[in-house]
From Swiss-Prot:
UniProt keyword Cytoplasm present: yes
Family indicated by similarity: Belongs to the class-IV pyridoxal-phosphate-dependent aminotransferase family.
UniProt record, GO biological process: carboxylic acid metabolic process; folic acid biosynthetic process; tetrahydrofolate biosynthetic process
Name of the protein: Putative aminodeoxychorismate lyase
Amino acid sequence: MEESNLFETTLYDGELFLLPSHLQRMKASAKSLGYSWPGEQYIENKLREAVQDTSMARVRWELSKAGDVTVQIVPIQTLEKAPYTLILDKQPSSTEKNPSCINKMTNRAIYIEAMNRNDAQYSKAQDVLLYNHQGFVTEATIFNVAFHRNGQWITPSLKHGLLSGTMRKNLLENGSIHEDDKGLLQKDNLKNGEQVLLFNSFRKVCKGVLIIQPEKACELLKKKDSSEKLS
């Protein structure tokens, strides 16, 4: 099996968005998995050198087990935030204690398989909502998620097997979302057509519509946005 690298992705728009959180997460994963760590300053210097000739870009960097760092820059003009269709997965995934879920790794088989079996395409603003074998909602394949419950937005608990996203961390710290400590976010409690918040450090926060019955996707996406606001 090919060795998996650690990686991070963020938005550069004059600043590398949430860079300290990205470096902190990568360092923690490197320590946990036995990857050589070249140091935060070394990585930051490589990133700043890579973006110096662009004003806005998608920035991705990888860390090999030997401690080698590679940086990829994709310049962009604007950041589209089209509403996403979030499709409930057809089957549970083994996410608990899965290194590829709780760390950000280039081995993304669990996410690729979910996209494929649900015929979802990122190019069509589609993603898939995963849940574990206990029925607890975890995350989408490229986003953390939050659902509106009891007057507030709540996000799945890390104990169910999901990535501790940097944007998730930011929203929790500023009180915009709250962690689900009551087990409310279960597959069987979801509602077809309900609004969901999707977030990562590249697209920041996007709106989405949950589709439990895919054939109703087009109809639901035409409905007026919910009056619920991110508080």
